[in-house]
């Protein structure tokens, strides 16, 4: 039995954040931490976690981290549908098509901010190809301003993440965790919550947007959020991995 992990990072977030100048309050997010602690590589593109592992993990840096300087700024601000959004989803679908097979027991989708919106959209895209209930979502503080930077809640289209028939989870998703920032006041970071559904566990945690998803150099609060996610994932995957066993390395 195998698991495929797909990691969608937040807007402007990428591995080079780890090398930001000390005077910048920047670091990697919980999305990249998850990929790396699983054993994922930034250089091994088949997603294999080790030479003998049947599990695979794929990582996609955030919207606004592709192309030249102007392209990056425009995508960070507007997240055009036919630019980074399309490129990321296209690559994720290609990775899925190349590596999904009937022995895949679970598909795990992890995302933060706009990356969380991409993860939720990706679930709808793969819904026709996977077994009902076989997908697990673990997302952090979804911000679905895709298409335009909708700062007014009244103007934010629900179609950005909410899918067919007005529900926010396709049938392929068996369980979903949504970690939400309790203290975020910025209008641009209003979360796109999930619908009321027995498959969903929505947890509000102290802190602002990047305290939940990571990205600050001082990331103690984000580490707490990460542990909540890791433990929840462990419970969802116990039937595959065995009691008390996690794929994550050096996490206790």
Regions found by a protein language model. Give the residues of each.
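Active-site- or binding-pocket-proximal scaffold segments within functional domains
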Residues: 1-252
């Amino acid at each position: 039995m195998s698991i495929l992990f797909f990691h969608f990072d937040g807007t402007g977030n990428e591995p080079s954040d780890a090398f930001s100048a000390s005077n910048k309050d920047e670091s990697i997010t919980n999305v990249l931490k998850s990929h790396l602690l699983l054993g994922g590589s930034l250089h091994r593109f088949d997603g294999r976690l080790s030479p003998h592992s049947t599990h695979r993990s794929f990582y996609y840096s955030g919207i606004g981290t592709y192309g030249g300087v102007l392209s990056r700024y425009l995508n960070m601000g507007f997240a055009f549908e036919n630019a980074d959004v399309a490129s990321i989803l296209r690559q994720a679908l290609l990775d899925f098509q190349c590596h999904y097979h009937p022995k895949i027991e679970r598909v795990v989708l992890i995302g933060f901010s706009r990356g969380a919106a991409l993860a939720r959209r990706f679930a709808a895209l793969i819904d026709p190809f996977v077994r009902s209930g076989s997908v697990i979502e673990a997302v952090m503080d979804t911000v679905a301003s895709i298409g335009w930077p909708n700062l007014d809640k009244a103007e934010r289209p629900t179609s950005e993440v909410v899918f067919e028939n007005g529900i926010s989870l396709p049938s392929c998703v068996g369980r979903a965790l949504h970690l939400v920032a309790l203290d975020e006041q910025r209008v641009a970071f209003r979360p796109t919550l999930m619908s009321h559904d027995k498959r969903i566990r929505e947890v509000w945690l102290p802190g602002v947007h990047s305290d939940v998803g990571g990205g600050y150099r001082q990331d103690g609060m984000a580490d707490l959020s990460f542990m909540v996610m890791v433990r929840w994932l462990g419970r969802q995957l116990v039937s595959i991995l065995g009691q008390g066993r996690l794929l994550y390395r050096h996490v206790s």
